[in-house]
Structures are given as structure tokens and as C-alpha cells.
């Protein structure tokens, strides 16, 4: 089984915010793959299905971003999913808005959701789909920025990035992740 986890914050007030691009991507995968997120356990909303011959788990932790590991670790244990089958989708301040970057492991890079996952999983060695949200301008606080919504000008770039992330997730079902990473990291 391959687990795709989108990071975000639960609740209407956080829908479509920069910090929730992981949730938005999981919602798109759910539609495209016809896997309803109709199960709830371990402080998460999730669904399972088969895509390209692979059993798939789609997850949206409902713990708030900074506690994502509290949902993901128990689900990984429950379904006996090895760390190399975990794919995490999240926002990244260090990438320009609309850009995606895949990587196989690394530090949290200041992202509290990733920090929680590393802490609870006991390892930073899991595949990541980073979606660029850019950096705040004009002295805006980071917390206000990530919890804000995309501007009208940013909407097309984010829609493209989410679509590219969906395509990368699909490719990761049938190709080695390093190959997928090389293919998608080249795209602008």
C-alpha cells in the first residue's frame, strides 16, 4: 500500500489557504482516482482504493498542521505501511508560488507539519511533494501569510501546481521515485 498524505489544517476557516495546498491536492486525487475520503480514525480523514494496480491510502490529518505526526504514525502502523511507501504533499515557502519540487528525504526546513512527521516517524526518510507558495511581502508575518488565501493572480499558478502534483503522484505509482523526481523537478 502507498500512502499519500496531504498536510493542512481542518475547518472551513482554513479551506483554500496557502497552508492547505496538501489538502487541496488530496481532494483532487480523491476525485480523479474515485477514492472517497469517507473513513475517520486516528484523528484523520482518509480513504483507500486501487489505482494502476496499487493499493492506495489517501490521508488528510485533522490534527492541525503542527501535530500531523499524531495522525500519520498510527495510520502507518495500522496499515503496516513501510516508510518508503509514504508520500507527503505540503506547502513550501522557499519555492516560488506555483512551483513544485520533489525530494526523497531531508530536514523539516522550518515546516512544523514535517517536523511533527519526522518526530513521530523517527526518521526524515520519506518522499515529499513540495508545492511553492512563495514568501510574504511588505513585512507580512509568515503565520498570517500561510493562513491567508491565494490572490486572484496566484490562482492559475496554484491550480497548475496542484495538477502537476497530481500527475507526479500518479507517476509515483508506477515508476521509481527518483525517476519521477527527475522528471518533475525539471519542469518549470
Curated annotation (Swiss-Prot):
Instruction: List the active site.
Output: 19
Provide the residue positions that the database annotates as binding tRNA. 14, 64, 66, 112
Coiled coil location: none
> Annotated site (Discriminates between blocked and unblocked aminoacyl-tRNA), which positions?
9
Q: Name one Pfam family in it.
A: Pept_tRNA_hydro
Q: Which reaction does it catalyse?
A: an N-acyl-L-alpha-aminoacyl-tRNA + H2O = an N-acyl-L-amino acid + a tRNA + H(+)
> Is the keyword Ubl conjugation assigned to this protein?
no
**What would you give as a GO molecular function for this chain, any one?**
peptidyl-tRNA hydrolase activity
Q: Which InterPro entries match?
A: Pept_tRNA_hydro (IPR001328), Pept_tRNA_hydro_CS (IPR018171), Pept_tRNA_hydro_sf (IPR036416)
Protein's cellular compartments: Cytoplasm
Record-marked site positions (Stabilizes the basic form of H active site to accept a proton): 91
Presence of keyword Cytoplasm: yes
Principal location = cytoplasm
Entry EC no(s): 3.1.1.29
Q: Which domain of life is it from?
A: Bacteria
User: What GO terms in the biological process aspect are recorded for it?
Assistant: protein quality control for misfolded or incompletely synthesized proteins; rescue of stalled ribosome
Gene Ontology, cellular component aspect: cytoplasm
Q: Which family does it belong to?
A: Belongs to the PTH family.
Q: What does this protein do?
A: Hydrolyzes ribosome-free peptidyl-tRNAs (with 1 or more amino acids incorporated), which drop off the ribosome during protein synthesis, or as a result of ribosome stalling.
- List the PANTHER family hit by this protein, alphabetically: PEPTIDYL-TRNA HYDROLASE (PTHR17224:SF1)
Q: What is this protein called?
A: Peptidyl-tRNA hydrolase
Q: What organism is the protein native to?
A: Bacillus pumilus (strain SAFR-032)
Q: Which gene encodes it?
A: pth
